[in-house]
Structures are given as structure tokens and as C-alpha cells.
């Protein structure tokens, strides 16, 4: 193998997911696969070299909590797939969301978030961050006036998901980005459910993209991790709202991250300050597993999507189903329009449906499934199911559940890569059992 020297920006997605970050075989061993660098620390050539690394004037490995060669390949690859300038892998998707908000907001600040988001993120915003003085206003992002009215001088970000959890509703990223930039604040998008194979939020104006890498990126339910991608386009200096990025930072030699790190200032500060001080570091082994997942991301997402649309069609025509929450069958013309705009190749293999009956009927249906695994993860190659009201969103009040489109008879499905006939047969048998 010779070194890839051609401009990788011309490569297609399927090629990028295989090669970015490892343009030649491992220089030490000639290994073709990315090695797992299972080390806690790195040797410096001399004291001046060590000082340069710690001062950020010489890019390179300092300590395992901050950087690792295996993680570096993963970070470069996901940044390229999302169209960002840099990325940071962390220990979980929850850590990615938490670090992103803490890098933007301080005591007395707030963010504006969509109502329909992952239950863990909702709980973080509603209950945990307020203990540190950071408030969240939850709004309907389909109502631009409501979004505008929620923003004030202390608002530091807008936060949405490309496909809402758990109902796969689609937000107009481009429109929301315009609102954010009009107020000189960044748009943060959780792209976990869509993946960059289906949509790249940065191309529509998003500034920061986060993922739970545990889901589609890993794809096999083997590892926990998260990632933050810096779009590199937001002008932190011109905004005037983010002194911790633009002013001399007393905890890091008095440097200004925007001046020293340029377009990658945001994610570099997360690494240099938050990751350094709080240590939610992804393991090298998990980074290796995520790289294995990325290599087949496009293939898996194609199958997930094909199967999901078949299941949606089946459920939408079933006599025991009250409703299906999926943008492809939405009765809302705006949802149909947004789905076609952002997902021309389909999407939304994680969605909900309401079975006719009460909560017990929903639980009985779930308990009669055999192919589907009842667990809290999603986006596995295996099909999964859960009852959101009593699990993933159980921290929410009844009103909060209804605001997020979750009722007692709501069931969430994550459609896997099995043969579609077997998936539908399993659903059919469960419906017969509770008829």
C-alpha cells in the first residue's frame, strides 16, 4: 500500500468511512488495520519538547486522558464524514452533550432546546444543569416565533436533534440555524439518529454536531462512547458572547483559543479544559470498535432504512395500531416537506407507534416479541423495542411525556438488519397474541 496523496475532499462517503485518518499503513508495524494503542502516557524527547506539547505550540500526544493515536483516527474520520474541521471522542453520548453545553454556557446562562429530545438529554437540561446555574427553555421548534421569543441576552445556544427521540420528527435545520446566527449564537445538533450518511447538519448551517457513538456509529451494541464535531464556521470573536473561547484563559497559560486554534477553537477547548479537568475519556479499545463500525456505516444504514420503511408501511395499515409516528407517513404537510428535503434517501429506523389499548396492552405486546430485544439501546444491527413512558422517559411528568408525543400505549421500535420478512412475522405474532 502506498500513501494516499490525493485530496480526500473529493472522495465519496463510502471511501471516507474506510480511509480517513489512516492514509498509509501503520508506520511502525505496517499493520493495515488501525492499531489499538493501549497506553496511558507518551515519552517526550526532552524537557523543551514536553513544554511545547503542554503549551499547545507542538501538536501531539500529552497524556491518555487527552489524546490517543487510535482515538485520533476515529476523530479525524467522523469529522470528515460530518464535514467538520475537528472532532473529539468522549466516554459517552451524554458526555458529548454535557461538555458541549458546559463549553458554551456558565452560571447564569441558558440554552433553548427542542422539546422532543432523548430522555437523558431532557433530564440533563431540566434537572442537572440548573444545579450549576444553567437553565434550559424547551420550545416547539416548528414554531419559529416561539423559538425567537425564548432567546434572550443570556442564551448561549439552540439545541435540536435531526430526528427527534423517540418519534423521528424532523426539524428544519436550515431555518433554525438562521435564527441562531441572527442572535449570534451557535446551533448544536444531535445527529445520532440520522448519521452523516443520511444528513450532514453542518451543510445546513449547524455549528456543532454531537453523537452517541454507541448507536449507529458503533452499530453492534458493544461499546459506549460519544463524539463532538466542530463545524469550524462559527465566528466566536464576532459574536462577543463567548469570552472563555476568545479571551485569555487563566487555566491554560492565558491563551485565547480562537487565536491559537483558529476554526477548531471550540473542540480544542473542550479537550484542553473540560476533558482535562473532568476526564470523560473514551477508551482506545472502544475507539477501535467505533472505527470498525464506521467502515460499514453506509451499508448498515441502507438496510436499517429499507427495513424501517417496510415496517412503517405494515404498522400504518394494521387494525390494532392507533397511529405511527414516522415522518414518511405524517399527516402534517410540513413534516412531509422537511422529510423530503433532509432525507431524500429515506431515514428514521427508530420511531414509535401507539397500539390500540392501554399501557398494559403495550407491555403485553412487547413481552410477546421474540426477535426484538427489550433493552434501552437503539440503532443496533438487531431489532430492539422498549416502552418509553416507563423506561427512557420515565423521569418525565405526564405533561412532559405528552409534550414529547409519548403516551401510555406508545411503543418505540429500533429496526435492525434482519430479513424484513422475519421482522414483520415477529410483529405479526405479537399482535395475534394480544388480539
Language-model region placement:
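Short, acidic Gly/Pro/Ser/Thr-rich loop/turn segments
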Residues: 25, 43-47, 235-236, 297, ...
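Short amphipathic alpha-helical segments
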Residues: 59, 85, 286, 290, ...
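Conserved C-terminal alpha-helix-loop-beta "cap" of PLP-dependent enzymes
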Residues: 301, 309, 313-316, 320-411, ...
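Conserved N-terminal alpha-helix of the aminotransferase class I/II PLP-enzyme fold
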Residues: 46-95, 120-128
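Short, glycine/acidic-enriched capping/hinge loops at junctions between secondary-structure elements
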Residues: 47-52, 100, 425-426
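PLP-dependent enzyme catalytic core of the Aspartate aminotransferase-like
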Residues: 1-3, 14, 85, 126-127, ...
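N-terminal "arm"/small-domain region of PLP-dependent enzymes with the aminotransferase-like
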Residues: 2-68, 76-77
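Conserved PLP-enzyme active-site core in the AAT-like
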Residues: 2-9, 17, 21-25, 87-317
Amino acid at each position: 500500500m502506498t500513501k494516499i496523496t490525493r485530496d480526500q475532499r473529493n472522495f465519496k462517503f463510502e471511501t471516507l468511512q474506510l480511509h480517513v485518518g489512516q492514509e498509509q499503513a501503520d508506520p511502525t508495524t505496517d499493520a493495515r488495520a488501525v492499531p489499538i494503542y493501549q497506553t496511558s502516557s507518551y515519552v517526550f524527547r526532552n524537557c523543551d519538547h514536553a513544554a511545547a506539547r503542554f503549551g499547545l505550540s507542538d501538536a501531539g500526544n500529552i497524556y491518555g486522558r487527552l489524546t490517543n493515536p487510535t482515538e485520533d483516527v476515529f476523530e479525524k474520520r467522523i469529522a470528515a464524514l460530518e464535514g467538520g474541521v475537528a472532532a473529539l471522542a468522549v466516554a459517552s453520548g451524554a458526555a458529548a452533550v454535557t461538555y458541549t453545553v458546559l463549553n458554551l454556557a456558565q452560571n447564569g446562562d441558558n440554552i433553548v432546546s427542542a422539546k422532543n429530545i432523548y430522555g437523558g438529554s431532557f433530564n440533563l437540561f431540566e434537572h442537572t444543569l440548573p444545579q450549576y446555574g444553567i437553565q434550559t427553555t424547551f420550545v416547539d421548534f416548528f414554531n419559529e416565533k416561539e423559538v425567537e421569543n425564548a432567546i434572550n441576552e443570556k442564551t448561549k445556544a439552540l439545541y435540536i436533534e435531526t430526528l427527534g427521540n423517540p418519534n423521528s420528527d424532523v426539524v428544519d435545520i436550515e431555518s433554525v440555524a438562521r435564527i441562531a446566527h441572527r442572535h449570534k449564537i451557535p446551533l448544536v445538533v444531535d445527529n445520532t439518529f440520522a448519521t452523516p450518511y443520511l444528513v450532514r447538519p453542518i451543510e445546513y448551517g449547524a455549528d456543532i454536531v454531537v453523537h452517541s457513538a454507541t448507536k449507529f456509529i458503533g452499530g453492534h451494541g458493544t461499546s459506549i462512547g460519544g463524539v463532538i464535531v466542530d463545524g469550524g464556521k462559527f465566528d466566536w470573536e464576532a459574536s462577543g458572547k463567548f469570552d472563555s473561547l476568545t479571551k485569555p484563559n487563566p487555566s491554560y497559560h492565558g491563551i485565547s483559543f480562537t487565536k491559537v486554534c483558529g476554526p477548531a477553537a471550540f473542540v480544542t477547548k473542550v479537550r484542553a479544559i473540560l476533558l482535562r479537568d473532568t476526564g470523560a475519556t473514551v477508551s482506545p479499545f472502544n475507539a477501535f470498535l467505533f472505527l470498525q463500525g464506521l467502515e460499514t456505516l453506509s451499508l448498515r444504514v441502507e438496510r436499517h432504512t429499507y427495513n424501517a420503511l417496510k415496517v412503517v408501511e405494515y404498522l400504518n395499515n394494521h387494525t390494532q395500531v392507533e397511529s405511527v409516528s414516522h415522518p414518511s407517513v405524517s399527516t402534517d404537510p410540513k413534516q412531509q416537506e422537511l422529510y423530503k428535503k433532509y432525507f431524500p434517501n429515506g431515514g428514521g429506523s427508530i420511531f414509535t407507534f401507539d397500539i390500540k389499548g392501554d399501557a398494559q396492552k403495550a407491555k403485553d405486546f412487547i413481552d410477546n416479541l421474540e426477535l426484538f430485544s427489550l433493552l434501552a439501546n437503539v440503532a443496533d444491527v438487531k431489532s430492539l423495542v422498549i416502552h418509553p413512558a416507563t423506561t427512557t422517559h420515565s423521569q418525565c411528568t405526564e405533561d412532559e411525556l405528552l409534550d414529547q408525543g409519548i403516551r401510555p400505549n406508545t411503543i418505540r421500535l429500533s429496526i435492525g438488519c434482519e430479513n424484513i420478512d422475519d421482522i414483520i412475522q415477529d410483529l405479526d405474532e405479537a399482535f395475534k397474541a394480544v388480539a
